[in-house]
Structure formats: C-alpha cells, structure tokens
Amino acid sequence: MTKWILMVLAWFALIAVLLYMKSYQSFSDRMQANEEKIYKTKKGNQRALVIFQDSKHGTVSKYADTVREQLLGKGYNVTVNHPRNDLNYDPMKYDLVVLLGPVYLGKPSKTFTDYISKNPFINRKIVIILVGYNPEDTRELKILEERLPNHNTVYTLKIGKEDTEQIGKIIKKATG
C-alpha cells in the first residue's frame, strides 16, 4: 500500500513539474502588446532598432533598458518594441538591430524566432542577446543565427540574470 501511495505522489509531482515548465514556455511564446517607444539623442543621427521579448521575471526588459541607454550614449536614436507579426519596421532603415529574448527549456520563444524569420535582415549589423539559465550553452544562438541571411554582421551573446557588463562589451563591439 505504501509503495502505491509513493508512486501516485511521484506521478503527481512529475505532472506538477511538467505543468510548471510548460507555463514558462507559454509565457515566453505569448504575443506582447505593441509598445513602441522612440528615444532621441542630440549626440548623433544613427538609428537603432531594439526588439525584445520579455521574460517572466523581467530580466530581458531590464537588459533592453541597458542596451537603450548605451546606444543613446553612443549617439543612436533608438526605437524599442516587442516582436509582433504586425510590426512594419524596415530593418534597412536602421544602422543597428538588437534582438533580445529569453530562453526557456533550451529554446528561444516562438514569437521571437518567427519575428527573425519573417524580416528581411540584409547587410545589417545585428546583435542577438539571449538570457538563459546556462550561458555556456549557445545552441539557441545558433538556431537564431541560422534564420538570418549570410550577408549580415552578427554579434551574439547568451547571458544569465546579472550580467550587464557583458552587454556593454557586445554593444561596444557592434558600434565599434
């Protein structure tokens, strides 16, 4: 009888863990609102597009703010929004495109991946920043890079929760 109860409890625990993990993936794959924000600088006239899919705990949003501030400091006018099917940004009108998103269960969100696949990034400087549990595992970056045409200069970074220093380095490298 005790073994049977333990087996039932183990199954309930397994189901609970799977549902918890699925909730993260569902959160990541949701379509966020169109919340375009345009930030102007008096330092220069270069343009940057920052597209970010927020994470469950707001880490990606925090990093998007860091990217925006750094780009403004380097003389870029910055447009910030979330990846959506109805966005009409022409990547060719931007000097730099920065894409930020979370990684859950070993993959980037479907919304984020679809946005990259559906947009004509040609001869652009592109920065891809993914936020995930294991920064050393960069398979997710390769998935996204493969969706971009070969005629782009792509800078990639996968980071954990508290790594704004790495963001500064990749932005500096991309804006050279």
List each model region and its residues:
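FMN-binding flavodoxin-like domain, especially the glycine-rich phosphate-binding loop
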Residues: 2-46, 59-62, 69-74, 96-101, ...
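Acidic/histidine-rich, surface-exposed loop or edge segments in extracytoplasmic proteins
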Residues: 46-54
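Histidine- and/or cysteine-centered catalytic micro-motif in compact active-site loops
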Residues: 53-54, 83, 102-103
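A short, well-structured beta->alpha microelement
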Residues: 74-88
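Glycine- and small hydrophobic-enriched segments that form the cores of compact globular domains
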Residues: 87-90, 121
